[in-house]
Amino acid sequence: MNYKKVEASDIAAIKELIPAERVFVGTEIGEDFSHDELGSIHSYPEVLIKVTSTEEVSKIMKYAYEHNIPVVVRGSGTGLVGACVPLFGGIMLETTLMNNILELDTENLTVTVEPGVLLMELSKFVEENDLFYPPDPGEKSATIAGNISTNAGGMRAVKYGVTRDYVRGLTVVLANGEIIELGGKIVKNSSGYSLKDLVIGSEGTLCVITKAILKLLPLPKMTLSLLIPFENISDAAGIVPKIIKSKAIPTAIEFMERQTILFAEDFLGKKFPDSSSNAYILLTFDGNTKEQVEAEYETVANLCLAEGAKDVYIVDTVERKDSVWSARGAFLEAIKASTTEMDECDVVVPRNRIAEFIEFTHDLAKEMDVRIPSFGHAGDGNLHIYVCRDELCQADWEAKLAEAMDRMYAKALTFEGLVSGEHGIGYAKRKYLLNDFGTEHLALMAGIKQTFDPKNLLNPKKVCQM
């Protein structure tokens, strides 16, 4: 890939388009902008631009297109697969200043936002207006465009679906700087190919998202959680298909193991309600009446006890809610704090294979003498599994990491699983995407990329590009 290097003349031209105080070069660019949350892939942009409008993005994309300069878009940088890392230098568009909630439409139940709005800010805003944005990824400081770019899911996906199900419309800037609208406030659309849905999950490789119209729901009046301990992960995960069949529909079904809970206790400095069992499922129920919620959780509680659960804890006090949900929210950071370096397997498998897959990771950890803690969304089969470096030397770490990842993704494929449930492919997981889908499937993806971005300027060498 032969791109133009950014020169002094380019910087001067860019500062004619964007105020100089929002254009950064060289040592002005902080180290954080060279990597994402996981930090295993590093590369600096040649110029960092903090954009504030669709029009500014359009101006920069036109300039980049005319001068053959690659462009990477970054939000909060909370990704885990290197998707926002500028492998070829070039321009980085940083969108966190585009953080306005533009409109709340209470008749159509939509909210229109700029790309840099944080998930936690969006959730707080709509809930203050008695409305509800269901997608609930664990990283609440992620931007909404980052969520859209990976089709993030989160804990509530088992009942409410994922980000794609809540994107009604997008404003995007194409590689050549053209601005187009995709979708809108409409509920139904059979008008040709759904370009909006191609953009969702494309990880910044097709265009730049500058505005989103999101679907909302009325806020449920009541929520309640259950924490249910089991003797082992096979029993805990094995109960999930039976819960789904029981006709009680939990908002969330999370699984967690004792060791991960202990990491969170150490990290947060406070105790979990119970950490004596080897495995747990955490369920949430919501609804508009106390009777509805109680009927559902009693059905599930009785089912779990009949299937070997050791107890059922109702998470109904402020103290217990804080203890349980702060721990669940801290699992990733707690595991990260327990080791010197780590990498993640964001695999998704059918619900009835979760227990087998986790048991496989236990056996793999023992065989390879590495720590492989995990947690995840049992309700939708999306597992978050971490290979920890600890005290391994660089050579041993690289060898063991590669082997562990290869074997886990290969096992997932035998279970009819896929490489990523919600964190995306980015740079780090490309070969596993190829293993899952094969060359013909990836050639179709590459053709879509070529149509949107004929000069291959947007986030090159990511997702389907080997």
Swiss-Prot record:
Alphabetical keyword list: Cytoplasm, FAD, Flavoprotein, NAD, Oxidoreductase
Activity regulation field: Activity is stimulated by divalent cations. Highest stimulation is observed with Ca(2+).
Recorded catalytic activity of this chain's protein: lactate + 2 reduced [2Fe-2S]-[ferredoxin] + 2 NAD(+) = 2 oxidized [2Fe-2S]-[ferredoxin] + pyruvate + 2 NADH
Cofactor: FAD
Temperature notes for this entry: Optimum temperature is between 20 and 30 degrees Celsius.
Enzyme class (EC, first level): oxidoreductase
Main location group: cytoplasm
Subunit details: Part of the stable heterotrimeric lactate dehydrogenase-Etf complex, which is formed by the lactate dehydrogenase LctD and the electron-transferring flavoprotein (Etf) alpha (LctC) and beta (LctB) subunits.
Function statement: The lactate dehydrogenase-Etf complex catalyzes the oxidation of lactate to pyruvate. It uses flavin-based electron confurcation to drive endergonic lactate oxidation with NAD(+) as oxidant at the expense of simultaneous exergonic electron flow from reduced ferredoxin to NAD(+).
Family listed: Belongs to the FAD-binding oxidoreductase/transferase type 4 family.
Protein name (record): Lactate dehydrogenase (NAD(+),ferredoxin) subunit LctD
Gene: lctD
